[in-house]
From Swiss-Prot:
<keyword id="KW-0081">Bacteriolytic enzyme</keyword>
<feature type="repeat" description="10">
    <location>
        <begin position="188"/>
        <end position="200"/>
    </location>
</feature>
<feature type="binding site">
    <location>
        <position position="322"/>
    </location>
    <ligand>
        <name>Zn(2+) 2</name>
    </ligand>
</feature>
<feature type="binding site">
    <location>
        <position position="53"/>
    </location>
    <ligand>
        <name>Zn(2+) 1</name>
    </ligand>
</feature>
<dbReference type="InterPro" id="IPR011055">
    <property type="entry name" value="Dup_hybrid_motif"/>
</dbReference>
<dbReference type="InterPro" id="IPR003646">
    <property type="entry name" value="SH3-like_bac-type"/>
</dbReference>
<keyword id="KW-0929">Antimicrobial</keyword>
<feature type="repeat" description="2">
    <location>
        <begin position="80"/>
        <end position="92"/>
    </location>
</feature>
<feature type="repeat" description="11">
    <location>
        <begin position="201"/>
        <end position="208"/>
    </location>
</feature>
<keyword id="KW-0677">Repeat</keyword>
<feature type="domain" description="N-acetylmuramoyl-L-alanine amidase">
    <location>
        <begin position="199"/>
        <end position="324"/>
    </location>
</feature>
<feature type="repeat" description="12">
    <location>
        <begin position="209"/>
        <end position="221"/>
    </location>
</feature>
<dbReference type="InterPro" id="IPR036505">
    <property type="entry name" value="Amidase/PGRP_sf"/>
</dbReference>
<keyword id="KW-1015">Disulfide bond</keyword>
<comment type="function">
    <text>Endolysin that degrades host peptidoglycans and participates in the sequential events which lead to the programmed host cell lysis releasing the mature viral particles. The N-acetyl-muramidase activity cleaves between N-acetylmuramic acid and N-acetylglucosamine bonds.</text>
</comment>
<feature type="repeat" description="9">
    <location>
        <begin position="175"/>
        <end position="187"/>
    </location>
</feature>
<dbReference type="GO" id="GO:0006508">
    <property type="term" value="P:proteolysis"/>
</dbReference>
């Protein structure tokens, strides 16, 4: 007989927590009730720890103790970095506390006994302090499906023979089912930017009109918070074919639609890298599919149906081209924003969301994992890029005077101020209306068309222009400001 513990100890692993040494063994299997520094590490399972803790001082490489199929590979699972392999007997081997980002396989992959599945670590659900080690647990195939049973059930692996659970697996199709890398900002567990939403009534599928990946968005968004430009907009979720950034809790108000009701009741999902020419249409569609899969998971978690009332577009609430690239591909380039076309776009999103809502798997090409640099350093770089220094006025070829200026503007005009796309001219298409009391952060000032204007870039990459007072080009005299500048 060969047990998993025998297998690991022969490789030099040492046991740090052994159920055979707990009080009441074997009758009261796994009752440990371990406390340290005021923390009960077994509280969730009622004091039980039906698992072995082992560690190695020689290597962090964690080998699979049996062959099988990966059914979970989650950086933020119930045991922190959580990896689960189902063996030939249909029982599940749980490898817990792995280093986040270290897992070598994705859900659906085949694994052979001895394959390195990840790295020994100390991650955990609550981010409590703990020593580096491996939590190894054998969940029975007949465990109930509720969370507590899935987390707390455990067979006595010291009595479980793995001698014949080492059959070679066909790994030729590994990687065909995509498991996205999840990135979490400090706001998920820490401080929040806004208040809780009064209700969750649906989702909005955006295109970011940018070229950044989700991991690149995180330092960029932090930098905007630091310099105050985050008030110009952000969404809760950013996704592409490789990664998902959970920037802010989905049940908190977002600034993603330029519409008070939509911001307070709808969850924003950004399809990343949508800037024309940044990536091929094929790769963009993979980004779109990944985003719709995440949207389906979130909608299902809130018990939302999938229909035209719950799947919405940005251009339903604000004068914008968003979702511009999805629109070009599924409705047609240059097609007008009519009700018929809006419904055509929504119906496409609905069809794909339903596919994932009903259990469809995400299948995309295997792309290289994007390496994340130190976020603090990236924040500093992004802040440096976003700082705008005051300069003297310059004039461009169209006769527009402009200069860089970094400040905030709060509207005081009772009727609000109409904003424009394309440039500082009242004849350009209307972008929207900034209402009394609303504030934006701008980075440039222009003088043209009888007005002084300010402009800023939205979180979707579009520049918006707004007149803030009158201006006489002949005398240089300016009128009363229609708001407050700080």
């Amino acid at each position: 007989m060969l047990t998993a513990i025998d297998y690991l100890t022969k490789k030099g692993w040492k046991i740090s927590s052994d159920p055979r040494t707990y009080d009441g063994y074997p009758k009261n299997y796994g009752y440990r009730n371990y406390h340290e520094n005021g923390i009960n590490y077994d509280e969730f399972c009622g004091g039980y720890h039906r698992a072995f803790d082992v560690y190695s001082n020689e290597t962090n490489d964690v080998p699979a103790v049996t062959s099988g199929t990966v059914i979970e590979a989650n950086d933020y699972g119930n045991f922190g970095g959580t990896f689960v392999i189902r063996d030939a007997n249909d029982n599940d081997w749980i490898y817990g506390h792995l280093q986040r980002g270290s897992m070598r396989f994705v859900v659906g992959d085949k694994v052979n006994q001895g394959d390195i599945i990840g790295l020994q670590g100390n991650s955990n659900y609550y981010d409590n302090p703990m020593s580096v080690h491996l939590h190894l647990q054998l969940r029975p195939k007949d465990a109930k499906k509720d969370e507590k049973s899935q987390v707390c059930s455990g067979l006595a692996m010291e009595k479980y023979d793995i001698t014949n659970l080492n059959a070679k697996q066909d790994k030729s199709k590994n990687g065909s089912v995509k498991e996205l890398k999840h990135i979490y900002s400090n706001h998920i567990k820490g401080n929040k930017i806004t208040a809780p939403k009064p209700s969750i009534q649906g989702v909005v599928i955006h295109n970011d009109y940018g070229s950044m990946t989700p991991s690149q968005y995180l330092p960029w968004l932090y930098a905007r918070e630091n310099n105050g430009t985050h008030v110009n907009g952000w969404a809760s979720v950013y996704a592409n074919r490789n990664e998902v950034l959970w920037y802010h809790p989905t049940d908190y108000v977002e600034w993603h639609c330029g519409n008070q009701w939509a911001n307070a009741n709808l969850i924003g999902f950004e399809v990343c890298e949508s800037y024309p020419g940044r990536i091929s249409d094929k790769l963009f569609l993979e980004n779109e599919e990944a985003t719709l899969k995440v949207a389906a998971d979130v909608m299902k978690s809130y018990g939302l149906p999938v229909n035209r009332n719950t799947v919405r577009l940005h251009n339903e609430f604000f004068g914008t081209s968003c979702p511009h690239r999805s629109w070009d591909l599924h409705v047609g380039k240059g097609e007008p924003y009519t009700t018929t076309n809006i419904n055509k776009m929504k119906d496409y999103f609905i069809k794909r969301i339903k596919h994932y809502y009903d259990g469809g798997k995400l299948e995309v090409s295997k792309a290289a994992t994007i390496k994340q640099s130190d976020v603090k350093q990236e924040v500093k770089k992004q802040e440096a890029k976003q700082i705008v220094k005051a300069t003297d006025w310059k004039q461009n070829k169209d006769g527009i005077w402009y200069k860089a200026e970094h400040a905030s503007f709060t509207v005081t005009a009772p009727e609000g101020i109409i904003t424009r796309y394309k440039g500082p001219w009242t004849g350009h298409p209307q972008a929207g209306v900034l209402q009394k009391g609303q504030t934006i952060k701008y980075d440039e000032v222009q003088k043209f068309d009888g007005h002084v204007w300010v402009s800023w870039e939205t979180f979707e990459g579009e520049t918006v222009y707004m007149p803030v007072r009158t201006w006489d080009a002949k005398t240089g005299k300016v009128g009363k400001l229609w708001g407050e500048i700080k």
